[in-house]
Amino acid sequence: EKGTPGFSQGKGEEKHGIRASNTSPLTLDEVVVPADNLIGGVPGQGLKQANQVFGYTRLMVAAMALGAGEAALEIAIPYAQERIQFGGPLSDKLGYTHKLIVPHQVNMLAASAYLEEVALRIDSETRDLQVEGSIGKLFVTEAATRCADDCMQALGGYGYISEFEVEKIKRDVKITCIYEGTSEIQQSIIATFRWKVARKSKGAFYGAMAAEMEALAAQRGDLGAADLARAAKAMQLAFDFATAQRLTKQQYLMFTLADMTTALEVGMALSRKAAAAADREAAVLAAAARVFSANAAQLFARGLRTLAQGTRLVEAEAGESLLEAAGAAQLALAGAGTVADMDTIADALFGRTA
Protein backbone atom coordinates (compact mmCIF):
# COMPACT_ATOMS: atom_id res chain seq x y z
CA GLU A 1 0.00 0.00 0.00
CA LYS A 2 1.05 3.61 -0.48
CA GLY A 3 3.09 4.75 2.49
CA THR A 4 4.48 1.30 3.29
CA PRO A 5 8.08 1.60 4.55
CA GLY A 6 10.55 0.84 1.74
CA PHE A 7 7.99 1.31 -1.05
CA SER A 8 8.41 4.30 -3.34
CA GLN A 9 7.03 5.44 -6.69
CA GLY A 10 9.21 7.15 -9.28
CA LYS A 11 8.26 9.92 -11.67
CA GLY A 12 6.16 9.14 -14.72
CA GLU A 13 8.05 7.80 -17.72
CA GLU A 14 8.13 9.56 -21.09
CA LYS A 15 6.89 6.88 -23.49
CA HIS A 16 6.78 6.19 -27.21
CA GLY A 17 3.00 5.71 -27.11
CA ILE A 18 -0.06 5.38 -24.83
CA ARG A 19 1.03 8.66 -23.26
CA ALA A 20 -2.32 9.23 -21.56
CA SER A 21 -1.61 6.16 -19.42
CA ASN A 22 0.70 6.94 -16.51
CA THR A 23 3.68 4.59 -16.24
CA SER A 24 6.19 4.93 -13.43
CA PRO A 25 8.72 2.67 -11.68
CA LEU A 26 7.84 1.10 -8.34
CA THR A 27 10.72 0.40 -5.96
CA LEU A 28 10.50 -2.11 -3.11
CA ASP A 29 13.48 -1.93 -0.73
CA GLU A 30 13.22 -4.48 2.10
CA VAL A 31 9.43 -4.09 2.10
CA VAL A 32 7.58 -6.31 4.57
CA VAL A 33 4.32 -7.55 3.02
CA PRO A 34 1.73 -8.87 5.51
CA ALA A 35 0.46 -12.40 4.92
CA ASP A 36 -3.07 -10.98 4.74
CA ASN A 37 -2.06 -9.19 1.52
CA LEU A 38 -1.45 -12.44 -0.35
CA ILE A 39 -3.32 -12.47 -3.66
CA GLY A 40 -4.64 -15.78 -4.93
CA GLY A 41 -4.91 -17.54 -1.61
CA VAL A 42 -2.09 -20.10 -2.03
CA PRO A 43 1.63 -19.24 -1.80
CA GLY A 44 3.78 -20.20 -4.78
CA GLN A 45 0.87 -20.57 -7.21
CA GLY A 46 0.98 -17.12 -8.81
CA LEU A 47 2.28 -18.14 -12.24
CA LYS A 48 -0.10 -21.11 -12.43
CA GLN A 49 -3.03 -18.86 -11.55
CA ALA A 50 -1.94 -16.24 -14.08
CA ASN A 51 -1.73 -18.88 -16.81
CA GLN A 52 -5.38 -19.74 -16.20
CA VAL A 53 -6.47 -16.29 -17.38
CA PHE A 54 -3.90 -15.58 -20.09
CA GLY A 55 -6.16 -17.23 -22.67
CA TYR A 56 -8.58 -14.33 -22.51
CA THR A 57 -6.41 -11.48 -21.22
CA ARG A 58 -4.10 -11.93 -24.20
CA LEU A 59 -7.14 -12.14 -26.44
CA MET A 60 -8.24 -8.78 -25.03
CA VAL A 61 -4.88 -7.24 -25.98
CA ALA A 62 -5.24 -8.75 -29.45
CA ALA A 63 -8.69 -7.17 -29.74
CA MET A 64 -7.19 -3.80 -28.80
CA ALA A 65 -4.64 -4.21 -31.59
CA LEU A 66 -7.36 -5.22 -34.06
CA GLY A 67 -9.22 -2.01 -33.27
CA ALA A 68 -6.06 0.00 -33.85
CA GLY A 69 -5.40 -1.66 -37.20
CA GLU A 70 -8.97 -1.14 -38.34
CA ALA A 71 -8.85 2.50 -37.21
CA ALA A 72 -5.71 3.09 -39.27
CA LEU A 73 -7.38 1.60 -42.35
CA GLU A 74 -10.46 3.76 -41.76
CA ILE A 75 -8.22 6.80 -42.13
CA ALA A 76 -6.15 5.56 -45.08
CA ILE A 77 -9.03 4.26 -47.23
CA PRO A 78 -11.01 7.52 -47.59
CA TYR A 79 -7.76 9.44 -48.01
CA ALA A 80 -6.88 7.21 -50.97
CA GLN A 81 -10.27 7.92 -52.54
CA GLU A 82 -9.90 11.69 -52.17
CA ARG A 83 -6.22 12.20 -52.95
CA ILE A 84 -5.64 12.82 -56.66
CA GLN A 85 -2.21 11.95 -58.03
CA PHE A 86 -1.05 11.36 -61.60
CA GLY A 87 -4.48 12.06 -63.04
CA GLY A 88 -6.62 9.97 -60.69
CA PRO A 89 -7.28 8.95 -57.09
CA LEU A 90 -4.72 6.88 -55.25
CA SER A 91 -7.39 4.22 -54.81
CA ASP A 92 -7.07 3.47 -58.54
CA LYS A 93 -3.33 2.76 -58.30
CA LEU A 94 -2.68 -0.94 -57.75
CA GLY A 95 0.84 -0.28 -56.51
CA TYR A 96 -0.77 1.73 -53.73
CA THR A 97 -3.79 -0.41 -52.90
CA HIS A 98 -2.17 -3.83 -53.27
CA LYS A 99 0.95 -2.91 -51.30
CA LEU A 100 -0.28 -0.58 -48.57
CA ILE A 101 -3.96 -1.38 -48.00
CA VAL A 102 -5.31 -4.71 -49.24
CA PRO A 103 -2.79 -7.04 -47.51
CA HIS A 104 -3.66 -5.43 -44.20
CA GLN A 105 -7.38 -5.65 -44.82
CA VAL A 106 -6.88 -9.38 -45.42
CA ASN A 107 -4.98 -9.70 -42.15
CA MET A 108 -7.58 -7.72 -40.21
CA LEU A 109 -10.34 -9.95 -41.59
CA ALA A 110 -8.34 -13.01 -40.57
CA ALA A 111 -7.65 -11.52 -37.15
CA SER A 112 -11.33 -10.79 -36.59
CA ALA A 113 -12.32 -14.32 -37.62
CA TYR A 114 -9.81 -15.92 -35.26
CA LEU A 115 -10.60 -13.71 -32.27
CA GLU A 116 -14.33 -14.30 -32.71
CA GLU A 117 -13.79 -18.07 -32.73
CA VAL A 118 -11.61 -18.12 -29.65
CA ALA A 119 -13.84 -15.69 -27.74
CA LEU A 120 -16.84 -17.93 -28.36
CA ARG A 121 -14.85 -20.95 -27.18
CA ILE A 122 -13.80 -19.13 -24.01
CA ASP A 123 -17.45 -18.38 -23.29
CA SER A 124 -18.54 -21.99 -23.81
CA GLU A 125 -15.59 -24.12 -22.63
CA THR A 126 -13.90 -24.60 -19.29
CA ARG A 127 -10.55 -25.88 -20.50
CA ASP A 128 -7.45 -23.73 -20.79
CA LEU A 129 -7.07 -21.84 -24.07
CA GLN A 130 -3.70 -20.31 -23.25
CA VAL A 131 -2.13 -21.31 -26.56
CA GLU A 132 -5.04 -19.93 -28.56
CA GLY A 133 -4.72 -16.68 -26.62
CA SER A 134 -1.03 -16.57 -27.48
CA ILE A 135 -1.73 -17.26 -31.16
CA GLY A 136 -4.28 -14.46 -31.23
CA LYS A 137 -1.97 -12.01 -29.51
CA LEU A 138 1.06 -12.87 -31.63
CA PHE A 139 -0.72 -12.69 -34.96
CA VAL A 140 -3.03 -9.75 -34.39
CA THR A 141 -0.62 -7.42 -32.59
CA GLU A 142 2.15 -7.93 -35.13
CA ALA A 143 -0.28 -7.60 -38.06
CA ALA A 144 -1.86 -4.45 -36.63
CA THR A 145 1.55 -2.88 -36.04
CA ARG A 146 2.52 -3.47 -39.68
CA CYS A 147 -0.89 -2.20 -40.76
CA ALA A 148 -0.51 1.08 -38.86
CA ASP A 149 2.98 1.56 -40.29
CA ASP A 150 1.79 1.12 -43.88
CA CYS A 151 -1.28 3.31 -43.32
CA MET A 152 1.08 6.04 -42.14
CA GLN A 153 3.07 5.50 -45.35
CA ALA A 154 -0.16 5.58 -47.35
CA LEU A 155 -0.80 9.17 -46.29
CA GLY A 156 2.65 10.29 -47.36
CA GLY A 157 3.80 13.41 -45.52
CA TYR A 158 0.39 13.81 -43.93
CA GLY A 159 0.88 10.48 -42.20
CA TYR A 160 3.73 12.04 -40.24
CA ILE A 161 1.54 14.86 -38.94
CA SER A 162 -0.29 14.43 -35.65
CA GLU A 163 -3.51 15.97 -37.00
CA PHE A 164 -4.16 12.92 -39.18
CA GLU A 165 -3.92 10.53 -36.19
CA VAL A 166 -2.27 7.61 -37.97
CA GLU A 167 1.11 8.37 -36.43
CA LYS A 168 -0.52 8.22 -32.98
CA ILE A 169 -2.11 4.87 -33.80
CA LYS A 170 1.29 3.62 -34.93
CA ARG A 171 2.87 4.72 -31.65
CA ASP A 172 0.08 3.36 -29.48
CA VAL A 173 -0.34 -0.04 -31.12
CA LYS A 174 3.29 -1.05 -30.62
CA ILE A 175 2.75 -1.67 -26.91
CA THR A 176 0.38 -4.53 -27.75
CA CYS A 177 3.40 -6.48 -29.06
CA ILE A 178 5.12 -5.98 -25.72
CA TYR A 179 2.84 -6.06 -22.70
CA GLU A 180 0.91 -9.11 -21.50
CA GLY A 181 3.92 -11.06 -22.82
CA THR A 182 6.11 -10.01 -25.74
CA SER A 183 5.70 -11.54 -29.19
CA GLU A 184 8.76 -13.65 -28.50
CA ILE A 185 7.20 -15.04 -25.32
CA GLN A 186 4.10 -15.93 -27.35
CA GLN A 187 6.24 -17.68 -29.96
CA SER A 188 7.91 -19.71 -27.20
CA ILE A 189 4.56 -20.70 -25.70
CA ILE A 190 2.99 -21.59 -29.04
CA ALA A 191 5.93 -23.65 -30.28
CA THR A 192 6.42 -25.52 -27.00
CA PHE A 193 2.79 -26.44 -26.39
CA ARG A 194 1.94 -27.24 -30.01
CA TRP A 195 5.06 -29.42 -30.20
CA LYS A 196 3.90 -31.26 -27.07
CA VAL A 197 0.38 -31.83 -28.39
CA ALA A 198 1.71 -32.93 -31.78
CA ARG A 199 3.82 -35.59 -30.05
CA LYS A 200 1.22 -36.61 -27.47
CA SER A 201 -1.57 -36.96 -30.03
CA LYS A 202 0.72 -38.91 -32.42
CA GLY A 203 -0.49 -36.88 -35.37
CA ALA A 204 -4.17 -36.72 -34.45
CA PHE A 205 -4.14 -33.00 -33.57
CA TYR A 206 -2.91 -31.75 -36.93
CA GLY A 207 -4.49 -34.70 -38.70
CA ALA A 208 -7.91 -33.46 -37.59
CA MET A 209 -7.10 -30.01 -38.94
CA ALA A 210 -6.05 -31.48 -42.28
CA ALA A 211 -9.20 -33.61 -42.49
CA GLU A 212 -11.43 -30.62 -41.72
CA MET A 213 -9.80 -28.48 -44.41
CA GLU A 214 -9.89 -31.33 -46.94
CA ALA A 215 -13.63 -31.70 -46.30
CA LEU A 216 -14.12 -27.94 -46.68
CA ALA A 217 -12.09 -27.95 -49.90
CA ALA A 218 -14.28 -30.74 -51.28
CA GLN A 219 -17.38 -28.75 -50.40
CA ARG A 220 -16.07 -25.32 -51.39
CA GLY A 221 -13.00 -25.23 -53.61
CA ASP A 222 -12.73 -21.45 -53.52
CA LEU A 223 -11.65 -20.80 -49.91
CA GLY A 224 -7.98 -21.80 -49.90
CA ALA A 225 -8.75 -24.80 -47.71
CA ALA A 226 -6.71 -27.20 -49.84
CA ASP A 227 -3.57 -25.15 -49.17
CA LEU A 228 -4.33 -25.22 -45.45
CA ALA A 229 -4.89 -28.99 -45.48
CA ARG A 230 -1.44 -29.45 -47.01
CA ALA A 231 -0.01 -27.06 -44.42
CA ALA A 232 -1.59 -28.99 -41.53
CA LYS A 233 -0.01 -32.23 -42.72
CA ALA A 234 3.32 -30.46 -43.14
CA MET A 235 3.04 -29.03 -39.62
CA GLN A 236 2.99 -32.47 -38.04
CA LEU A 237 5.96 -33.55 -40.14
CA ALA A 238 7.84 -30.39 -39.17
CA PHE A 239 7.36 -31.03 -35.45
CA ASP A 240 8.33 -34.69 -35.89
CA PHE A 241 11.45 -33.58 -37.76
CA ALA A 242 12.36 -31.05 -35.05
CA THR A 243 12.12 -33.84 -32.48
CA ALA A 244 14.12 -36.37 -34.48
CA GLN A 245 16.84 -33.86 -35.35
CA ARG A 246 16.98 -32.44 -31.81
CA LEU A 247 16.10 -28.94 -32.97
CA THR A 248 13.66 -28.13 -30.17
CA LYS A 249 16.36 -26.33 -28.18
CA GLN A 250 17.09 -24.08 -31.16
CA GLN A 251 14.97 -21.10 -30.17
CA TYR A 252 14.88 -19.42 -33.58
CA LEU A 253 13.70 -22.64 -35.21
CA MET A 254 10.99 -23.01 -32.59
CA PHE A 255 9.90 -19.45 -33.38
CA THR A 256 9.69 -20.51 -37.03
CA LEU A 257 7.42 -23.41 -36.06
CA ALA A 258 5.28 -21.04 -33.99
CA ASP A 259 4.83 -18.71 -36.95
CA MET A 260 3.85 -21.64 -39.15
CA THR A 261 1.14 -23.03 -36.88
CA THR A 262 -0.11 -19.51 -36.16
CA ALA A 263 -0.63 -18.86 -39.88
CA LEU A 264 -2.34 -22.24 -40.24
CA GLU A 265 -4.77 -21.82 -37.35
CA VAL A 266 -5.65 -18.22 -38.16
CA GLY A 267 -6.14 -19.14 -41.82
CA MET A 268 -8.50 -21.95 -40.88
CA ALA A 269 -10.66 -19.52 -38.91
CA LEU A 270 -10.90 -17.19 -41.90
CA SER A 271 -11.80 -20.04 -44.26
CA ARG A 272 -14.52 -21.21 -41.86
CA LYS A 273 -15.94 -17.71 -41.63
CA ALA A 274 -15.87 -17.34 -45.41
CA ALA A 275 -17.72 -20.64 -45.78
CA ALA A 276 -20.49 -19.40 -43.47
CA ALA A 277 -20.78 -15.94 -45.04
CA ALA A 278 -23.64 -14.83 -47.23
CA ASP A 279 -24.60 -12.02 -49.59
CA ARG A 280 -22.08 -9.31 -50.48
CA GLU A 281 -19.68 -10.22 -47.69
CA ALA A 282 -19.18 -13.73 -49.03
CA ALA A 283 -17.18 -12.84 -52.16
CA VAL A 284 -14.78 -10.58 -50.27
CA LEU A 285 -14.23 -13.09 -47.47
CA ALA A 286 -13.64 -15.88 -49.98
CA ALA A 287 -11.07 -13.76 -51.81
CA ALA A 288 -9.41 -12.84 -48.51
CA ALA A 289 -9.33 -16.51 -47.47
CA ARG A 290 -7.60 -17.45 -50.72
CA VAL A 291 -5.02 -14.68 -50.37
CA PHE A 292 -4.33 -15.53 -46.73
CA SER A 293 -4.05 -19.28 -47.33
CA ALA A 294 -1.66 -18.73 -50.25
CA ASN A 295 0.52 -16.52 -48.08
CA ALA A 296 0.39 -19.13 -45.31
CA ALA A 297 1.42 -21.88 -47.72
CA GLN A 298 4.38 -19.83 -48.92
CA LEU A 299 5.35 -19.11 -45.30
CA PHE A 300 5.27 -22.88 -44.71
CA ALA A 301 7.54 -23.49 -47.70
CA ARG A 302 10.07 -21.00 -46.33
CA GLY A 303 9.77 -22.39 -42.81
CA LEU A 304 10.29 -25.96 -43.95
CA ARG A 305 13.38 -24.93 -45.89
CA THR A 306 14.73 -23.14 -42.81
CA LEU A 307 14.27 -26.29 -40.74
CA ALA A 308 15.69 -28.58 -43.39
CA GLN A 309 18.57 -26.52 -44.73
CA GLY A 310 19.02 -23.47 -42.53
CA THR A 311 21.42 -24.90 -39.94
CA ARG A 312 24.56 -27.02 -39.71
CA LEU A 313 22.68 -29.46 -37.49
CA VAL A 314 20.79 -31.37 -40.20
CA GLU A 315 22.28 -33.77 -42.72
CA ALA A 316 21.46 -32.84 -46.31
CA GLU A 317 19.68 -36.12 -46.99
CA ALA A 318 17.43 -35.75 -43.95
CA GLY A 319 16.58 -32.19 -44.92
CA GLU A 320 15.69 -33.18 -48.46
CA SER A 321 13.49 -35.97 -47.14
CA LEU A 322 11.52 -33.49 -45.02
CA LEU A 323 11.02 -31.10 -47.93
CA GLU A 324 9.78 -33.90 -50.16
CA ALA A 325 7.51 -35.52 -47.56
CA ALA A 326 5.99 -32.19 -46.49
CA GLY A 327 5.37 -31.06 -50.07
CA ALA A 328 7.42 -27.88 -49.71
CA ALA A 329 7.63 -27.38 -53.47
CA GLN A 330 3.85 -27.57 -53.87
CA LEU A 331 3.29 -25.21 -50.94
CA ALA A 332 5.67 -22.71 -52.53
CA LEU A 333 3.55 -22.70 -55.70
CA ALA A 334 0.41 -21.48 -53.90
CA GLY A 335 -0.89 -18.12 -54.98
CA ALA A 336 -2.49 -18.55 -58.40
CA GLY A 337 -5.02 -15.75 -58.85
CA THR A 338 -3.83 -13.75 -55.85
CA VAL A 339 -3.69 -10.42 -57.68
CA ALA A 340 -7.21 -10.95 -59.04
CA ASP A 341 -8.40 -11.71 -55.51
CA MET A 342 -6.75 -8.54 -54.27
CA ASP A 343 -8.59 -6.67 -57.04
CA THR A 344 -11.88 -8.03 -55.69
CA ILE A 345 -11.05 -6.87 -52.17
CA ALA A 346 -9.91 -3.43 -53.38
CA ASP A 347 -13.08 -3.00 -55.44
CA ALA A 348 -15.16 -3.60 -52.32
CA LEU A 349 -13.02 -1.38 -50.09
CA PHE A 350 -12.97 1.59 -52.44
CA GLY A 351 -16.38 1.17 -54.06
CA ARG A 352 -14.80 0.62 -57.46
CA THR A 353 -16.71 -0.85 -60.38
CA ALA A 354 -15.19 -3.42 -62.70
Residue ranges and their predicted role:
Residues 1-66, 70, 85, 162, ...:
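FAD-binding core of flavoproteins
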Residues 78, 113-116, 145-153, 240, ...:
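Charged/polar positions within long, soluble alpha-helices
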Residues 18, 124-214, 280, 284-354:
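Alpha-helix capping/hinge segments and adjacent helical runs
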Residues 39-60, 73-106, 116-133, 159-163, ...:
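Glycine-rich cofactor-pocket loops
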Residues 1, 29, 62-64, 93, ...:
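Generic beta-strand/beta-sheet core signal
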Residues 67, 102, 106-109, 138-145, ...:
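Generic structural signal for well-ordered, non-transmembrane alpha-helical segments
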